Amino acid sequence: MDPYKIIKKPLISEKDFELIEKENKLVLWVALKATKKQIKEAIELLYNVKVDKVNTLITPKGTKKAYVRLSDFDDAADIASRMGLF
């Protein structure tokens, strides 16, 4: 699956900004059929970072959300600014 089709867009809320600052996590809308492994590979390829962990959930509306924990060497705030969140 194409990395640009896996990652749809980042989430922008107060809770998401707290996760970026405190836990070094990004929160993203992703393709419904994307696996955790595909999400990890897409983030690593598109943003040149090391991903520690990916947690996913499917919302009641039928969309998929991914919580991506970056390694300690990479800064989630830097990636968020590259995505245009800051």
Q: What annotation goes with each model-predicted range?
A:
Residues 1-86:
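Contiguous, often N-terminal, cationic amphipathic patches that form binding interfaces
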